[in-house]
Amino acid sequence: MKGTPSFGKMNKSHTHIRCRRCGRNAYNVSKHYCAACGFGKTKKIRRYSWQNKKVNGVRIR
């Protein structure tokens, strides 16, 4: 067995819960921010150009 006895306690609670702003199951309880929309970290909604693919499947740079 590897790891310390404390490592066995890691899987008991949920890391992510449902986010108040985006509704996705991505709000980190311990870090107090949403991995999907950035709620708790920034006022602006987290969004990147690589998230959505264009209609013809080619990404324009």
From Swiss-Prot:
Q: Which Pfam families match?
A: Ribosomal_L37e
The question of whether rRNA-binding is a record keyword is answered with yes
Cofactor(s) recorded in Swiss-Prot or TrEMBL? Zn(2+)
Q: Where is Zn(2+) annotated to bind?
A: C19, C22, C34, C37
> GO CC terms on record?
ribonucleoprotein complex; ribosome
InterPro entries cross-referenced by the UniProt entry = Ribosomal_eL37, Ribosomal_eL37/eL43, Ribosomal_eL37_CS, Ribosomal_zn-bd
Q: Does the keyword Ribosomal protein apply?
A: yes
Where do the zinc-finger regions (C4-type) map? 19-37
Q: How is the cofactor bound?
A: Binds 1 zinc ion per subunit.
Highest taxon of the source? Answer: Archaea
Keywords from the named record: Metal-binding, Ribonucleoprotein, Ribosomal protein, RNA-binding, rRNA-binding, Zinc, Zinc-finger
The GO biological-process annotations, alphabetized, read as: translation
Give one GO term, molecular function aspect: rRNA binding
- Matching HAMAP family, A to Z? Ribosomal_eL37 (MF_00547)
Known function: Binds to the 23S rRNA.
What family does this chain come from, according to its entry? Answer: Belongs to the eukaryotic ribosomal protein eL37 family.
Q: What is the protein named?
A: Large ribosomal subunit protein eL37
Protein species of origin: Saccharolobus islandicus (strain L.S.2.15 / Lassen #1)
Name the encoding gene, please: rpl37e
